[in-house]
A protein has these predicted regions:
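Positively charged n-region of N-terminal signal peptides that target proteins for export
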Residues: 1-4
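Bacterial N-terminal signal peptides
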Residues: 6-16
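Predominantly soluble domains enriched in secretory-pathway, periplasmic, or organellar proteins
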Residues: 17-323
Length: 323
């Protein structure tokens, strides 16, 4: 009997240990892809349908095959490149060139430059809104967003944001949300009228940079460097739902609706991975180690892989993370 009780106690102890063990995301580095050339980087955009990954790199954009990870092309002459937006229905892509205060338009098939549009000062993040067929370029030093017709490249308007814009997302229903880095706010825009509808504070978060969106629960996931927090917002009311700690120098966020995972990548060299338990509850699964300075990423919604730019011993490298 004593042996039986001891055995049962041991089993229960192991079960308790398993129950208390922290859940893991399963993400780890599965491939390191070296890219020729030196220089910094910023945003990564994954075209899930076309199976391409666009990576900003100094004065050009590197284009990778999303499945083989091979470098398939380069888009040159994009000085101070920051972001890339894809308008697949028009066969066009749009690149912010921060040093020339312009947006460069390119052909998605040939990667050839089609034109250039002058915008505000130091354009940074850029996104395509499928509801209006417009491209929104965030002018970091002009406190504004330039709105471009994706079909013909003409400027349809400029929105005064009242602060320095960082990342932006669209809900596909006529709403655009933009983080203001210096104001620690998320701005709600009517993408049809180009009117500012709301300025929503992100307190206790400060220095708002990264932003992602879940269309099903209508939740925004803002990454804030000040306080090192992810702030979850209601996209309809602007109410702060909850906050969660993340690493330092966050600069990109992503949401995977299939796995119900939220990602926040940070310059401290980690990606915080949260599970969305419900619309209002989020559990930290893991802080996945990447590389110091690897503050941005792109999510492939088909394979659930992450593409993370890094500087590995002086070599520009794309870290591919999978499960």
């Amino acid at each position: 009997m004593k042996r039986t009780l001891a055995f049962l106690a041991a089993i229960l102890g192991l079960a308790g240990t398993a129950t208390l063990a922290a859940p893991q995301s399963g993400y780890h580095i599965i491939k390191k892809v070296p890219i020729p050339g030196a220089g910094g980087w910023d945003y990564v955009t994954v075209d899930d349908a076309a199976r391409r990954v666009y990576v900003s790199h100094a004065t050009q954009v590197e284009v990778l095959n999303a499945d083989t990870f091979e470098l398939v092309g380069t888009i040159p002459n994009t000085p101070g490149v920051h972001g890339i937006a894809i308008a697949s229905e028009f066969g066009r892509g749009f690149i912010t060139a921060g040093k020339s205060d312009s947006v460069i338009i390119f052909d998605l098939k040939t990667l050839k430059t089609l034109g250039e549009v002058k915008v505000g000062k130091k354009p940074d993040a850029i996104m395509y809104d499928p509801a209006t067929k417009h491209v929104f370029a965030m002018n970091g030093d002009s406190d504004s967003a330039t709105v471009i017709n994706a079909a013909d490249g003409t400027v349809v308007g400029t929105i005064d944001l009242g602060g320095g814009p960082e990342f932006a997302v669209a809900d596909g229903k006529g709403n655009v949300y933009i983080n203001l880095e210096d104001k620690a706010e998320t701005v709600h825009i009517d993408s049809n009228t180009l009117k500012v509808l709301h300025h929503w504070p992100l307190a206790p978060g400060k220095t708002a940079t990264a932003l992602a969106f879940d269309p099903q629960t209508r939740r925004l996931f803002a990454g804030c460097r000040g306080g090192q927090l992810m702030v979850v917002l209601d996209a309809d009311t602007g109410r702060v739902i909850t906050t969660a700690p993340i690493g330092e120098r966050v600069d990109a966020a992503a949401y995977d609706p299939t796995q119900k995972l939220v990602f926040q990548s940070t310059g401290g060299g980690t990606i915080a991975v949260f599970h969305q338990d419900s619309a209002d509850k989020y559990t930290l699964l893991e802080n996945v180690v990447t590389n110091p300075g690897s503050k941005t990423m792109g999510l492939d919604l088909k394979t659930h892989r992450l593409f993370v730019p890094a500087n590995l011993e002086g070599t520009f490298t794309i870290l591919v993370l999978g499960q």
